Swiss-Prot record:
Gene Ontology CC, one term: plasma membrane
Protein name, as recorded: Ectonucleoside triphosphate diphosphohydrolase 3
Gene name tied to this protein: ENTPD3
Covalent S-S links between cysteines: C92-C116, C261-C308, C289-C334, C347-C353, C399-C422
Effect the entry attributes to changing W187A: Complete loss of activity
Cytoplasmic side, ranges: 1-22, 507-529
Amino acid sequence: MFTVLTRQPCEQAGLKALYRTPTIIALVVLLVSIVVLVSITVIQIHKQEVLPPGLKYGIVLDAGSSRTTVYVYQWPAEKENNTGVVSQTFKCSVKGSGISSYGNNPQDVPRAFEECMQKVKGQVPSHLHGSTPIHLGATAGMRLLRLQNETAANEVLESIQSYFKSQPFDFRGAQIISGQEEGVYGWITANYLMGNFLEKNLWHMWVHPHGVETTGALDLGGASTQISFVAGEKMDLNTSDIMQVSLYGYVYTLYTHSFQCYGRNEAEKKFLAMLLQNSPTKNHLTNPCYPRDYSISFTMGHVFDSLCTVDQRPESYNPNDVITFEGTGDPSLCKEKVASIFDFKACHDQETCSFDGVYQPKIKGPFVAFAGFYYTASALNLSGSFSLDTFNSSTWNFCSQNWSQLPLLLPKFDEVYARSYCFSANYIYHLFVNGYKFTEETWPQIHFEKEVGNSSIAWSLGYMLSLTNQIPAESPLIRLPIEPPVFVGTLAFFTAAALLCLAFLAYLCSATRRKRHSEHAFDHAVDSD
């Protein structure tokens, strides 16, 4: 009898079921893993959002001859043609006089800054304090102090540097800027605020405006005055008053000159010294620019302890002697006398000369007059643009007033300024008309302005714009739809799952082939028997 060896149907069905279920599970897991991997990769790549790289801040202290003003500026860290789009966010006036008045007590300068600096700390996010640059630029007052007493000027700057190094900001130094730099930075500020460098197009992108004419800048401080503009004619490039300025990818050839000792305060000292020189009496004088019924006494030192008037000192000079000036409120005589502080004859009627023999190309285009120019026009109840006749008639009317009438005319009455507005107005007339050569036709092109929008017209903004050329731009930030740790973890998990499924399926395929091979061998053995 023979025994037949064969697999029962039940056994074969059980083996097939044993392999089929894991295979289906592995295929499903593999398919799901592939779908998830493709999906999160597509989402991560195509749904990412490009964010602006945030804001940067900068602080500039404008240390003028009569006061110090602190400005806080901000701009996008990603810049336009290497220059930041800067805006003013905060302004604080330091109490007291300018830093040049601390020549005899430089250790007291930091105390004056403290109140404003505490406010500034609240304007800049605390986590950005360490990366926020702070600069102090001193102007004509310190330029004069350096010429008069370099040691005192250096001690004032050293005291300032010591103070700011203890502050949380990135202190970049305290320096005395040149008159030429002051003029250029003022010109940059004026044109930037008026949109002559950049404007937003329909797509809200910053672009250079086509065919826009730049605006000249007229700045009046306490110790100096500046004029800056792009001339229309060929300029004498051999003079030091020609500068090239690069902003937002464009280069501008600029004429700029700073007149030391012709700021409002120093010019008035020159005027008082001239009155003393021409007076038969040396202790009681009349002043045609002071209002009627007003008198004031100064020491000789107040008038002559300045480099701007030292050459006008009388022979018997004693800084403690007292001089009394009595106002006569004479508009005609005031206008005549003020002209004498300028040396117009030095130009010998040359068209390309302003005064004191200084070269100046012919003026061209619109101008903005700010700082002291604006405040004087405002005292005359004038602002914006107006005719030369209007300016002259307003000056005449103001200079004709009694002292008791001035508080009624001035919104903010301050004796120091009120007594001098008549002088300042006549000073502006001679500077603009006989010096810069503005005429009845070109005068209305002068716009007397204090600020544009929320930003003051001051050299400090132009200084900040220039500095942003040297501050590296940051790349835009990319915000991903899936946080990187989650994305990496998910990617690793489903990649591992897919690989395990592939390995398992490969194992099943190999096991199936071995099984079939053994079945084939078994059947062959049975047939042989």
